[in-house]
């Protein structure tokens, strides 16, 4: 029946039986979705990254000011502000130190069954990480953490908590029932007065840079300026996080197409699902970064279109590509070993007269971890060997 005079179906329903029938249908559909895709199990990231510095920096052997983090419960990108180097400050130190601190907090707050500290949300995590840093500099940062403690209607419902300060961005792609991947979530850049060169950022400088600098401003930025989002996590989701070097130069469709072309659409049946190989994730991140740099070069005498105009912007460029997979017992066991090894190293480094770690024992430990199957959520040893759990 059409609504009077409007030529459309009525949307105001007061019939109780109709309401109950609709509710029952929605519950059945959600139960089917949970049964097929979720299985009420903890999830984690299986991730890899790739970075490429500004071409001029590469020619002059200067440091890449970006940092990336790939760990089971948290992926992140931090983009150091290179102009700080004009004051004799290494722009790469603060981003790396910040992500190292964030990774440590995520390890102790978010690992399922291994957490020893309460998780109070992404803003608190970045605040605590910032307080743990000492380096001078300025950086933007974006983190995405998997929180496996969330429950909806009494069932485990992992969430991805995204926190962004500045102009790094993140996309989450999900495969639908029709087998196609679609962007289900995207952040927006935080830039001051719309200026493409001036992102919101966390800074720490001394009086030689700014005699009137207030060190408390960083905490104000974290508390009042952080963009925080929560998104349901589903096994098989693809997460793409990148610095502005990616998102200034590539349209979202271009990033999605790279992922679609390179990452096979796997069955969403949990019994048949297999994580993507880590080398493939690295190559996807690499192709996204290379495509970003290519957009800053003329083609057939013309500069290509980019989100910020013709020719985009040459920049340090970094990208993390992750797949959401099940957190398995094998993965949990591996990380128990890693944490034990880290605590042992910490004790040795804090005690005078102690002998250094036996390299053969350390190598054997790494070998044991690397033997964990990819189906068990990939070998974290590969991440550990790159330092700070794939902190680059």
Model-identified regions with their sequence ranges:
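PP2C/PPM-type serine/threonine phosphatase catalytic domain
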Residues: 1-392
